[in-house]
Regions:
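C-terminal accessory module of base-excision DNA glycosylases/AP lyases that mediates lesion recognition
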Residues: 1-34, 122-123, 137-213
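Alpha-helical ds-nucleic-acid-binding substructure associated with the helix-hairpin-helix region
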Residues: 4, 23, 27, 55-56, ...
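A positional/architectural concept
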Residues: 12, 18-65, 69-72
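Structural motif
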Residues: 36-44, 91-95, 184-192
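A general alpha-helix detector
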Residues: 45-50, 82-86, 124-128, 160, ...
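Short alpha-helical scaffolding segments that buttress acidic/His motifs in well-ordered protein cores
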Residues: 46-51, 100-104, 143-144, 194-198
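A broad detector of the eukaryotic-type serine/threonine protein kinase catalytic domain
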Residues: 51, 84, 108, 112, ...
């Protein structure tokens, strides 16, 4: 099994992590089973990730509703023929308009094959996706984790994951992506569960203790 599809998969990974380090046992005691957060793979889900980046949940939902309305049906071809006015009406920032168009072009030109990524390694997915203009490490990581459901995906560049790791593992400073990637090597092949637990742990800490990102 290389993908996470249900809570039973999460529980298997949680048990494996808990045997590696007692810190995970304490995290799990605080969070319980973290949200699965699976979504379909493909262009629409990738577009949703791009739209929601650096927005609050409420803002992301509002902009996404406008994107789906203005650019319906949301396909790569529809994005490529969208006028500048339609893009403006969708509520997307100019950088996100550019990224969405770049992704649509990469798919139609067969430079980005989202179907082939479903059986690829995390490293290949990351390299393949970030080769497209506008797709950064965070976008690739989130797609890998929640759209492909890879059990060993991770999100070392996510600020909430970094902050949760800092608190949980009693680190002096919030780890940089490279530092967190190195720390997470010990969590293979369950880094996808580790990421979900750290997100859930961050949410618990933020709601109860008021930590900030």
């Amino acid at each position: 099994m290389t993908t996470i599809t249900c809570n039973a998969d999460l529980e298997e990974g949680m048990a494996a992590l808990a045997t590696l380090d007692p810190v995970w046992g304490r995290i799990i005691a605080r969070t319980g089973i973290p949200p699965l957060r699976r979504r379909d793979s493909g262009f629409v889900s990738l577009a949703s990730i791009i739209v929601s980046q650096q927005l609050s949940v409420a803002s992301a939902h509002a902009v996404w509703a406008r994107v789906e309305s203005v650019l319906s049906p949301l396909t790569p071809d529809r994005v490529l023929v969208a006028s500048d006015e339609e893009m403006r009406l969708s509520g997307l920032s100019r950088p996100k308009q550019k990224t969405l168009r770049a992704v649509a072009a990469a798919i139609t030109e067969n430079r980005l094959d989202l179907t082939s990524l479903e059986t690829a390694t995390p490293e290949f997915v990351h390299a393949h996706m970030t080769a497209v203009s506008g797709i950064g490490p965070w976008t690739a990581d989130v797609y890998l984790l929640f759209c492909l459901g890879h059990r060993d995906g991770f999100a070392a560049g996510d600020l909430a994951v970094q902050e949760a790791a800092k608190v949980a593992f009693d680190l002096p400073l919030r780890p940089k992506p490279a530092e967190l990637t190195e720390l997470a090597e010990a969590w293979r092949p369950w880094r996808g569960v580790a990421a979900r637990l750290l997100w859930a742990y961050y949410a618990a800490l933020k709601s109860r203790e008021g930590i900030s990102a």
